[in-house]
Regions:
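Loop/turn positions that initiate beta-strands
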Residues: 272-279
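Zymogen propeptides
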Residues: 21-257
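Conserved, well-ordered active-site substructure
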Residues: 118-147, 151, 155, 294-366, ...
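Beta-strand-rich structural segments
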Residues: 432-446
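Bacterial Sec-dependent N-terminal signal peptides
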Residues: 1-23
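Low-complexity "stalk/linker" and mucin-like segments enriched in Ser/Thr/Pro/Ala/Gly
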Residues: 458-474
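Short, solvent-exposed loop/linker segments at the N-terminal edge
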Residues: 426-432
Length: 480
């Protein structure tokens, strides 16, 4: 069976031409913006490629637009190797987490800044890939923030996005039948009078509380009770496992936790006995609003707020330099998510400073936006079309610490249930021929065929005719 597309070519080619080429101001400079690619690639998701031409430079830009109201699309972060340390390419993260018929990670970008070298406190375990600041994936806190200049993108389980104007506030608690104590962080270095919670994602699966002062730290293991799961903002009942110890760099049990502290925190930990029940709560708040985020990544600076470019370049030294950049943001109604990469350090694309990146995000439809890790990390991946941008390391993807992904939760289906154009809209002159590129999609809107052949096109005879091959239009009509 052949599928048919009826081409209202005069309407499509003329109206879409205004969409394909416009003028847009990028930090006081006018650029001609040409759409070089635009197509649906998955449930509620399109990918768009742009060429911006200015007075003395060009820029290549690639972005995803995701309809968060689509029932078959989800947004998820991945911490590389599913551990606090470890690096993978964006492609590797997507492929390793995809489960056919359950969750296909069909598009994504790199995430926040991460350690590119170094070892843990033991001096031997690598920390390469460890996020510099907060990271949450599948509701699990991999790390909390350690810097006031961090800004965060988070999204809830019901797909409501948030972007902080300041560092996400984190103050957890551990409560016994008679007492409670503040938890100051997760998987970060301990401090005097503070309790830190360590998870089994730690490098070496130990607390890494070592060094000259480590004999002063008290530690004890905890395990969630049956049916309990520790996620941001939801109290979790746990049981103390074993006796507390001092200065042991304690091993963290699979699926469990260890709390560590010294000074005033020491007596609290010493009061815990094997079998005691405790409750742990780890709330996070964005600009004062407590949010139960399911996924979170970190960047800086925040570049767009309420649709306005923010004067935040002073927050990081390289913000005023031209580099490849990655950004994430969302529309004013929070129903559209934008994930964007601008290439840089190439002959065809200079790269941008963060104020320019903000204007690119405005063009793409964002009202709020955050600068993520860029440079050689900048990557925009799709499962069917590959990496869409040109990573600055000669096109080779860098292994990074985390990524943000668009996930199809639709059932698996390899049957082509619909077709659509994948050729950038443009104008053709009378007498010219035009053969559009056509993509095939399953019933859930997932791109499954980029080489469709079993289709024919038709058109109104007043604008031209279709050749015998059924796929080539000739513009020889008088118009509508």
């Amino acid at each position: 069976m052949k599928l048919k597309i009826y081409l209202w070519l005069v309407l499509w080619l003329t109206v879409c031409n205004s969409y394909a080429s416009v003028t847009w101001k990028v930090w006081n400079t006018d650029y001609r913006v040409d759409t070089t690619f635009h197509a649906k690639i998955g449930p509620g998701t399109t990918q768009t490629s742009l060429l911006l031409t200015g007075p003395d430079t060009t820029l290549t830009v690639f972005y995803l637009t995701v309809d968060l109201t689509d029932p078959y699309v989800d947004i998820r972060t991945v911490c590389a190797t599913d551990h606090l340390a470890g690096a993978q390419t964006v492609t590797q993260m997507a492929e390793s987490h995809s489960v056919e018929g359950e969750s296909l990670y069909f598009a994504g970008i790199n995430g926040g800044f991460f350690a590119m070298s170094g070892t843990a406190n033991d001096g031997k375990t690598s920390i390469v890939g460890r996020p510099h600041h907060a990271s949450v994936a599948e509701g699990e806190i991999y790390r909390t923030s350690t810097s006031a200049i961090c800004r965060h993108f988070g999204i809830t389980s019901d797909k409501v996005p948030y972007l902080s104007s300041a560092s996400v506030d984190f103050t957890g608690t551990i409560t016994t039948a008679t007492d409670s104590y503040e938890i100051s962080g997760v998987n970060v270095n301990a401090g005097n009078n503070k309790i830190i919670l360590y998870t089994d994602k730690m490098p070496g699966q130990v607390t890494q509380v070592t060094g000259s002062s480590f004999p002063m730290y008290y530690e004890v293991a905890l395990m969630p009770k049956a049916g309990e799961r520790l996620v941001p903002g939801k109290p979790c009942k746990m049981t103390v496992k074993g006796a507390w110890a001092r200065g042991t760099n304690m091993a963290i049990p699979d699926g469990g936790y260890v709390i560590s502290g010294k000074g005033l925190a020491g007596p609290f930990i010493q009061s815990l006995n094997d079998g005691d029940e405790v409750e742990v709560n780890l709330p996070m708040s964005f600009d004062g609003e407590t949010v139960m985020v399911e996924h979170l990544t970190t960047g800086n600076p925040k570049i767009l707020g309420n649709g306005e470019v923010l004067n935040t370049e002073g927050e990081r030294a390289d913000a005023i330099e031209w580099h490849p950049r990655t950004s994430i943001g969302y529309s004013k109604d929070k129903k559209k998510l934008i994930m964007l990469v601008c290439d840089g350090r190439t002959e065809i694309s200079r790269g941008v400073r963060t104020r320019e990146l903000a204007d690119l995000m405005r063009y793409a439809g964002a009202d709020e936006a955050l600068n993520l890790d860029g440079g050689g990390s900048s990557t925009l991946y799709t499962s069917m079309l590959g990496v869409r941008n040109y990573p600055s390391s000669k096109g080779v993807q860098r292994k990074v610490g985390d990524g943000v992904f668009v996930v199809s939760t639709a059932p698996a289906s390899s049957f082509v249930g619909g077709i659509d154009f994948a050729t950038p809209p443009h104008v053709i002159s009378k007498g010219e021929e035009y053969s559009p590129t056509v993509y095939g999609y399953n019933a859930y809107g997932l791109l499954i065929n980029t080489e469709m052949s079993n289709y024919t096109i038709t058109c109104d005879e007043r604008i031209g005719y279709v050749k015998a091959d059924g796929k080539t239009f000739v513009a020889d009509g008088i118009g509508l």
